[in-house]
Amino acid sequence: MKASLRLRLDQLCDRHEELTALLADAEVISDNKRFRKLSREHSDLTEITEVWGKYRQAEEDIETAEMMKSDPDFKDMAEEEIQANKVLLEELESQLNILMIPKDPNDSNAAYLEIRAGTGGDEAAIFSGDLFRMYSKYAESQGWRIEVLSENEGEHGGFKEVICRVDGDGVYGRLKFESGAHRVQRVPATESQGRVHTSACTVAILPEIDVDTNVEINPADLRIDTYRASGAGGQHINKTDSAVRITHIPTGTVVECQEERSQHKNKAKAMALLVSRLENAKRAAADAATSEMRRDLVGSGDRSERIRTYNYPQGRMTDHRINLTLYKLDAIMEGDLTELLDSLHREYQADQLAMLAQENGG
């Protein structure tokens, strides 16, 4: 292992010890915001610290075994000990390399899921509904909670647009590779000739940003409108102007929330979504400056970037970014996304490791 990496790991362990002490300090405990921030940093460093401790212990065990080799009675046992620990060192070093990949600070956050029908008319709206159901099923399997903020239903089912908040541990980190254009090839229910049609939907995944700590928005830059929510009616139909639309005038960004009966709650939720939209746009602009220097699996986040095809006649799903094809479309549409998401994360880790090796001179 390189000396520079050893030094960095020692520094991280020192920081972990420092954080442990800080989190026991009464002054820190009384400051909720600071306590949460330090707790998250402590949690991020815990696994690295534990694995680095195991690595150093394995090195010490090898040194001890090397000294035992001089005794004929213990030579064979010492050789076995040395070989076993060398294998362990390789495994632990691989773990450390992955753990040292820079983490997106938003990975542990909740996320906003936005699905919009693209080309394909009614069929695109129906497929938007299918994608929403797919993500909802996956969220349920993970113990996450989905809260719809606004929806615009299609005339024949599904959604022209649906925006929701997905709450749970590590939601953004798990779903962030889903942004892009999703294409479907199938025979629509409305197709009398049995011809396969191609439609598309766009998906955007945005990390939820803490409204209180990260962003300052001038109230003068906002136009806030209230209106009566549209929908299919029924027991939850809005009889008052409780739906809220907020426009950020400098950027033209528009958000809305219509699901709560309380105008105050709708405004708060719309404001939280606006903050996340603005921060995401700012981050995308900053990333664009360095995007030409590296291949990034997350891509530009451009909704026109086609990332996946769902082919119903062949029962397959293909992710074009990593050339992965899975012939279990029915299971995927029922929310079985584990194999797909794991594959995307492995590819991302491989990209990041290659980039780190390049930055460290090979």
From Swiss-Prot:
Record GO cellular component, one term: cytoplasm
Keyword check for Thylakoid: no
SUPFAM superfamilies reported for this sequence: Release factor (SSF75620)
Subcellular location as annotated: Cytoplasm
Broad class of the protein's primary localization: cytoplasm
SMART domains, alphabetized: PCRF
Keyword match RNA-binding: no
Domain of life: Bacteria
Keywords, alphabetical: Cytoplasm, Methylation, Protein biosynthesis
Disulphide connectivity of cysteines: none
InterPro entries for this protein: PCRF, Pep_chain_release_fac_I, Pep_chain_release_fac_I_sf, Prokaryotic/Mito_RF, RF-1
Gene Ontology molecular-function annotations: translation release factor activity, codon specific
Pfam families from the UniProt entry: PCRF, RF-1
PTM annotation: Methylated by PrmC. Methylation increases the termination efficiency of RF1.
List of residues that carry N5-methylglutamine: 235
Sequence similarity: Belongs to the prokaryotic/mitochondrial release factor family.
NCBIfam families: prfA (TIGR00019), PRK00591.1 (NF001859)
Function: Peptide chain release factor 1 directs the termination of translation in response to the peptide chain termination codons UAG and UAA.
Protein name: Peptide chain release factor 1
Organism: Acinetobacter baumannii (strain AYE)
Gene: prfA
